[in-house]
């Protein structure tokens, strides 16, 4: 009987929904397992094929863990506030709440059609006031503990979204969401003091099971460094403090650089000290148009202006050195001023070469260095020279001695610094959580009473941002005007809203108890489910959501609101699914290729023409999927044509889970054929109890490998092993009932619909569904082959293949080889000069004559 995937999948999805098969409650009799995937932003486009890769992988793990006897929590929800919905709503004149509901309904139906074992009773939505009540509550706690504050500051302003962006949301100088130019503006912003948790965020990684690249990216983003603050005098009578990790090179500082925004530059301009004020102001204006990323690119051309009229004074030798402003120094890192040692820093060397500044060697290596050609930056082998009391010391010892000198002479101190900046928490948009703060002329900023939460968004129709950069909420005076919770006088609400990252910074906690009225979750639920055992997501969220949520969780732990110091015990990441580039020559239809070859004479010339037309990306046959390229694959179409089980199986089989992989439609058909072969085995049952001797070893090997591979996300090799087993069953005339049952069990996490149907077909009752049926066990001793096949070569040419005992010794293997008729014929009349046995693989006989 042919497998009717549409009927079977609809049947089992209804069973799971009607019977709440995957609903979970606290059960202390079982070990808990909390699996988490990043909840999606429900866009109007619906799911793309990239979403199911992560969801399927953890669904496979969750299904196996249930069969291993775990109490599994695997939830799903919606990260539904944010700019794309608001922009769509403005364009189409629909309220964002309606857009969100429609998008969520579409996403939910798509996910259910893929057969994921989510507990839908725990579904959450960040735009639900009963959810964001607790987002607001967390923000109030941050404020009450001094971790939320308002500040006038230089901010990243997206010219497209018309709102402020966090540093992490600016990629290559443009908005990571809409791609518009990002410029700097001065605005009053709410900030969260994530820097107060910098050490905890780094140190906490040590006890976690995060893949190395995730942990490394977080450490690099936080950027903890150990160095010194050094106080340089100036000829204007001021002090310029710099932060350096190389205080050992202080004798080699030949100039200083300050950021264009440095407060001292403004002061010198105001006092008329600078003789080239016009040039300085022009450079400041130019720098203000660049993002921090553009300014700090290592390979960008170094620019700057010397400050005429003031000099710095090196504290170790009282030498006067010039001061420059340059945009490669950022006001947001360190002190906004640096000492420049061009002999031992590449950027300083490039700057010094451009402006003709002195280069003094103060660290000498074991081999001569040519400072005319490059800076010497080898810290490991360097010895101090031309450095007074540091001469002859190693770099490490010189750092310690210099810090001692600075502290003893009141010229500086040791200092730990971080690249991490505080989190810009304001957005000048409508579709976000209202910030629960009011401003009173008498009392200043005041938090709303917790009893008044949630502070809900007003139901308005005019939610376009204004050209002045104010939130659209500011125009709705009836909502803005309120009373001060402290004195009862008139006050105004904060009109900025929270960033999209707010709701996703604690959502994993709400899943534990989504209907709790009195707290983010009940104490019992938090203690039972915390922490998340396994969290999978995209690498692009490593320095955004993942860092923010760890910060919030650590804060909640510190105030006693959650029982674990870390939110996630294990973090893995999946590779992106890529698409074919329609502008690459190799992907063009044959007739189009032929046309180009005729026109340009060769493939190389045709490829060059395509590159001129479409840009550098035309070189790459495989690229990121995008609507503009028309290479986005709709999962609904795949499910309709092949079924959800085929879609799931293919996404797990398409390559190394952690690496990017190209979508190949032809390979989907191969996965579909494999499932058809498994289904057909139910019509090819052979007589016999248990596993037949000729298949028993492979059965145990497969149980072992599939189980281990699932736990290490080596899904592609697990499926390959199942394919090997199914081929072997066909080679042996079919499968016994026990053999097919094991195949069905092992395949179930990947293809749950078909396998549940086969399980029923094999005679199991409805109460014995595979969802909770015990995972098959293997015997280690039976995983070892009792016989192996060895090749027999004569002078390197294979003459025979023999089945021999796996533990056969060399003498017996060689004797068996010589006894084979084909080998004996090849040896006849020849002199045997060498015999080699490679255990379990081959016998090689060398002859002459």
Q: How does the language model describe each region?
A:
Residues 1-46, 72, 201, 215-225, ...:
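Non-catalytic terminal extensions that flank enzyme cores
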Residues 1-36, 66-75, 99-106, 283-324, ...:
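Conserved oxyanion/phosphate-binding beta-strand-loop segments in alpha/beta enzyme cores
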Residues 2, 18-19, 91-248, 263, ...:
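Residue patterns forming the tRNA-binding/recognition surfaces of aminoacyl-tRNA synthetases
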Residues 3, 224-229, 237, 364, ...:
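Long, charged, mostly alpha-helical binding arms that flank functional sites
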Residues 3, 8-13, 49, 135-364, ...:
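NTP-handling and nucleic-acid-processing catalytic cores
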Residues 25-94, 100, 123-138, 244-245, ...:
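N-terminal catalytic cores of NTP/NDP-binding nucleotidyl/phosphoryl-transfer enzymes
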Residues 79, 144-145, 149-156, 414-443, ...:
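Helix-rich, typically C-terminal accessory recognition domains appended to large enzymatic cores
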Residues 214-241, 290-319, 323-324, 423, ...:
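Flexible, glycine/threonine-enriched loop-and-boundary segments that flank and lead into catalytic domains
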């Amino acid at each position: 009987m042919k497998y009717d995937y549409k009927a079977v999948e609809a049947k089992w999805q209804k069973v799971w929904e009607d019977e709440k098969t995957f609903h979970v409650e606290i059960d202390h009799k079982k070990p808990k397992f909390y699996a988490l995937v990043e909840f999606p932003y429900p866009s109007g486009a619906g799911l793309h094929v990239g979403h199911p890769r992560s969801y399927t992988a953890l669904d496979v793990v969750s299904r196996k863990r249930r069969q291993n006897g775990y109490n599994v929590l695997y939830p799903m929800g919606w990260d539904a506030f944010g700019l794309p919905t608001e922009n769509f709503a403005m364009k189409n004149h629909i309220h964002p709440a309606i857009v969100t509901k429609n998008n969520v309904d579409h996403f939910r139906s798509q996910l259910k059609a893929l057969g994921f074992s989510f507990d839908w009773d725990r579904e959450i939505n960040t735009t639900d006031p009963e959810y964001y009540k607790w987002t607001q509550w967390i923000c109030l706690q941050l404020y009450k503990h001094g971790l939320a504050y308002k500040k006038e500051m230089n901010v990243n302003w997206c010219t497209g979204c018309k709102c402020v962006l966090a540093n992490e949301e600016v990629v290559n100088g443009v908005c990571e969401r809409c791609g518009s130019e990002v410029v700097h503006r001065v605005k009053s912003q709410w900030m969260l003091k994530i820097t107060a948790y910098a050490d905890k965020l780094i140190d906490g990684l040590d006890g976690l099971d995060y893949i190395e690249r995730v942990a490394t990216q977080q450490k690099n983003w936080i950027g903890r460094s150990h160095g010194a603050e050094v106080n340089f005098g100036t000829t204007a009578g001021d002090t310029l403090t710099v932060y350096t990790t190389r205080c050992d090179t202080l004798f080699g500082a030949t100039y200083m650089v300050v950021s264009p925004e440095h407060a001292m530059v403004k002061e010198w301009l105001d006092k008329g000290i600078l003789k080239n004020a016009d040039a300085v102001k022009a450079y400041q204006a130019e720098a203000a148009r660049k993002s921090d990323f553009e300014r700090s690119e290592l390979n960008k051309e170094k620019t700057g202006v010397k400050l005429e009229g003031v000099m710095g004074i090196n504290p170790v030798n009282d030498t006067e050195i010039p001061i420059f402003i340059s945009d490669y120094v950022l006001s947001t890192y360190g002190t906004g001023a640096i000492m420049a040692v061009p002999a031992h820093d590449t950027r300083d060397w490039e700057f010094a070469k451009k402006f003709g500044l002195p280069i003094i060697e103060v660290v000498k290596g074991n081999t001569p260095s040519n400072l005319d050609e490059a800076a010497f930056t080898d810290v490991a082998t360097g010895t101090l020279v031309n450095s007074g009391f540091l001469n002859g010391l190693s770099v490490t010892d010189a750092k310690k001695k210099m810090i001692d000198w600075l502290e003893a002479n009141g010229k500086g101190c040791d200092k730990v610094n971080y690249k991490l900046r505080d989190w810009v928490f304001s957005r000048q948009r409508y579709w976000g959580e209202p910030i629960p703060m009011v401003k009173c002329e008498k009392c200043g900023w005041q938090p709303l009473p917790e009893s008044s939460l949630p502070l809900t968004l007003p139901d308005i129709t005019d939610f376009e941002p204004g050209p002045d950069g104010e939130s659209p909420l500011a125009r709705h005076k009836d909502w803005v005007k309120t009373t001060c919770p402290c004195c009862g006088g008139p006050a105004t609400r904060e009109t900025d809203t929270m960033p999209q990252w707010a709701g996703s910074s604690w959502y994993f906690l709400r899943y534990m108890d989504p209907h709790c009225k009195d707290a983010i979750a009940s104490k019992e639920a938090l203690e039972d489910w915390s922490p998340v055992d396994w969290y999978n997501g995209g690498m692009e969220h490593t320095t955004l959501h993942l860092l923010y949520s760890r910060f919030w969780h650590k804060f909640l732990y510190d105030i006693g609101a959650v029982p674990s110091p870390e939110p996630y015990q294990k973090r893995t990441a999946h590779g992106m699914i890529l698409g074919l580039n329609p502008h690459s020559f190799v992907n063009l239809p044959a007739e189009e290729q032929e046309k180009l070859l005729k026109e340009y004479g060769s493939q190389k010339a045709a490829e060059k023409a395509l590159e001129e037309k479409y840009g550098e990306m035309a070189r790459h046959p495989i690229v990121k999927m995008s609507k503009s390229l028309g290479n986005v694959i709709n999962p609904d179409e795949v499910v309709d044509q092949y079924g959800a089980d085929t879609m799931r199986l293919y996404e797990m089989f398409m390559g190394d889970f952690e690496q990017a992989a190209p979508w190949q439609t032809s390979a989907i058909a191969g996965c579909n054929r494999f499932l058809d072969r498994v289904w057909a085995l139910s019509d090819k049952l052979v007589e016999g109890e248990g596993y037949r001797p000729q298949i028993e070893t492979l059965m145990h090997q497969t149980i072992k490998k599939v189980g281990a591979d699932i736990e290490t996300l080596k899904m592609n090799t697990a499926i390959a092993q199942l394919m090997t087993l199914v081929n072997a069953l066909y080679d042996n005339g079919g499968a016994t009932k026990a053999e097919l049952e094991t195949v069905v069990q092992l395949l179930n996490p990947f293809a749950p619909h078909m396998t549940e149907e086969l399980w029923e077909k094999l005679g199991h009752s409805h109460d014995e569904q595979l969802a909770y049926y015990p995972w098959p066990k293997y015997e280690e001793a039976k995983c070892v082959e009792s016989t192996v096949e060895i090749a027999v070569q004569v002078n390197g040419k294979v003459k025979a293949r023999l089945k021999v005992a796996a533990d056969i010794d060399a003498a017996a293997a060689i004797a068996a080889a010589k006894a084979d008729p084909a080998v004996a014929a090849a040896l006849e009349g020849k002199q045997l000069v060498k015999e080699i046995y490679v255990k379990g693989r081959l016998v090689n006989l060398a002859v002459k004559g």
